[in-house]
Amino acid sequence: MSTTTKIIQTTDIPKIKGGLPFLGHMIPFAKNPFIFMKKVSDQAGEVAQFKIFNQRMILLTGNDASKLFYRSSDEQLDQSAAYKLMTPIFGKGIVFDAPIQKKNEQLKMLMPALRMNAMRQHSGKIITEVEDMISDWGDSGEINLVEAMKQLTINTATHCLLGKEFRYELTNEFSDIYRDLEKGVNAIAYSFPNLPIPSFRKRDKARVRLHELVHKIIEKREASNDKHTDMFQMLIDTRYKDGTQLSSNDIAGMLVAAIFAGHHTSSGTSAWVLLELLKNPFHMKEVTQELDSLLGSDGNVTFQNLRETPKLENTLKEVLRLHPPLIVLMRQVAEDLLFKNHQIKKGDMVWASPPVTHRMAHLFRNPEVFDPDRYTPGREEDKNLMAYQPFGGGKHKCSGNAFAMFQIKSIYSILLRKYTFEFVDTPDTYVDDYGEMIVQPKSPCRIRYKRRTADTFISKYGTAGDQQEASSQCPAAPSTKAQPATTTTEATTNPTFYISIDKQLCQGHAMCAGESPELFNVSNNVATATVASPSVSMLEKAQCAANHCPNAAIKITTDHSSK
């Protein structure tokens, strides 16, 4: 009996012309990474190859190619090998420098501070930081918006995530340390992270100093009887699965990783929210009216009532589509892959580019137009998770995405009710600065502000925030106890629905368990449905949980076959 082997004919991946000996396409990439990759995608399509130094790069853009990038396993596409530039920042053996299992274990340690219950506690801290920032603004004036947002978001991130020592005792020094670390992420670092250049020397000195500070704080806390509930203390108390305690170097690296997750995606985005609203007065009016109606002139801002701001949220989503903070995401190919008869070889570096995919007309209608309504019911252009990817995708999606969204919404729930704003310079001068790998608007980014008066409010509820906290919650379930799985008899008289959870997307934010503890449980950073087929009376609660999942990992269906 003979057997036959099917031979798959492969075709070459389209090559980008040009490039210099040894350097390849490094010069145009370093000059403007976004423009370079947009041209690559426009010329070659969803998969293209080029070289940076002697490394073959494969750019994957669009829906299908992005699915390969975000859905492949770690055994196929190695995230850690692609991010060696982060080792001098996080430290040896931390996150991307750790074996896969240890890296995943470390990232799970950070999740409790980014979950729903923690964020309920964060709201007051964020509001305090915003009010501190504007306390000396007076009735009118001018600011550099980019610098103001950089300082505000580092203050909120340290206050919420690191603890009082970093926020109140080391404020200026930690800000300087963080900025030196952040400047170590640039185009050169992707290929040569250890070159003896000034920015890398500053980065390395900052990392050493951070370790020293962390070690001193640990010693101080161990000698004190004070009780701490912040992420810092959580890491001090946490153990690896084998019982090993985290070293001070481990903790320093983990804290920086947490700040990168909760800050670097939000400072530039925070600035762009205001800039885009100023460029689009109609949407500015809608967002301001929404906040006025919900909170009045002095209503309290809470985690719950900020969920009732769809216009602000859709504005933020659209800002993230047009101005995603990361230009490129990377993986190293660990085993040969086939994509539409194109062979991607072991050792290749594959890239995804959110800003390029976000501007594809077949994925987003009129992609260059600022249009927050594209996320409203009936359009929902963010539902395709392989197209809308400001925080990445798959199981490696940025775990700080929910915190970043909440942080920015909190900031503008205060600023837009306190002041009106206007450009100092002509609107077309406010553009992205692609000279950095973490995108910000170009500086100086000058904005003029003026305090609002009571007669400018659309509605005045006073302390409406307190009233809204209760009324804006998802509808209560008929019972606070978990329901048993529906029996066949019940299904006949009481229709059911089905819950499925994409384990690759779920990161354990626990929004679902917070909204519907009757239906969901989170253990070991993975959510599970506690009821196999709930009665339809629980459908509204389940849909609420699905709507608030930051990773869109929950699917509600009425057809068991599609579960």
Regions found by a protein language model. Give the residues of each.
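Cytochrome P450 heme-thiolate "Cys pocket" and heme-binding signature region
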Residues: 256, 303, 342, 355, ...
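Conserved cytochrome P450 catalytic core segment spanning the I/J/K helices
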Residues: 21, 28, 115-117, 154-155, ...
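Iron-sulfur cluster-binding cysteine motifs and their immediate structural context
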Residues: 511-524, 546-560
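Cytochrome P450 catalytic-domain helical core, especially the substrate-recognition surface
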Residues: 13-38, 42, 56, 83-162, ...
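Conserved cytochrome P450 K-helix/beta-meander segment immediately N-terminal to the heme-binding cysteine loop
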Residues: 352-380, 458-466, 474
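Conserved cytochrome P450 K-helix E-x-x-R motif and the immediately C-terminal K′/meander segment
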Residues: 25-45, 212, 216, 300-340, ...
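Central I-helix of cytochrome P450 enzymes
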Residues: 153, 157, 210-217, 238-293, ...
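Cytochrome P450 heme-binding "Cys pocket" and the immediately downstream C-terminal segment
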Residues: 281-283, 403-438
